[in-house]
């Protein structure tokens, strides 16, 4: 898999997680979906960077991926290929 294909695959996964994440607020009301702006606010990464990551135009570093994962309530697992 080329680096470009890897970037696109990571971006697609982030977009999928962002659109399917669920959480419960103080009133126990479930919400689904999250905009790039909401994710940006939660993880501290500019919205235009999130957009570029999702589209595969920007290669996010591990720190940025960790911030995104935490904001989405996920964790990053490293798997040896």
Q: Which ranges hold each PLM region?
A:
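A short, Lys/Arg-rich alpha-helix, primarily the initiator
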Residues: 1-31
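Small-residue (primarily alanine) positions within well-ordered alpha-helices
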Residues: 11, 40-43, 69
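Residue-level detection of the helix-turn-helix DNA-binding "recognition helix"
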Residues: 19, 44, 55-57
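Short alpha-helical DNA-recognition segment
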Residues: 23-52
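Alpha-helical DNA-recognition elements
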Residues: 51-52, 56, 67
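DNA major-groove recognition helix of helix-turn-helix/homeodomain DNA-binding modules
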Residues: 61-78
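Small, basic N-terminal interaction modules of short regulatory proteins
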Residues: 81
């Amino acid at each position: 898999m080329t680096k470009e294909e890897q970037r696109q695959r990571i971006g697609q996964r982030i977009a999928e997680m962002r659109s399917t994440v669920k959480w419960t607020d103080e009133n126990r009301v479930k919400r689904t979906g999250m905009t790039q702006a909401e994710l940006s606010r939660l993880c501290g990464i500019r919205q235009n960077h999130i957009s570029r990551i999702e589209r595969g135009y920007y290669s996010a570093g591990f720190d940025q991926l960790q911030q995104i994962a935490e904001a989405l309530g996920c964790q990053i697992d490293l798997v040896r290929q």
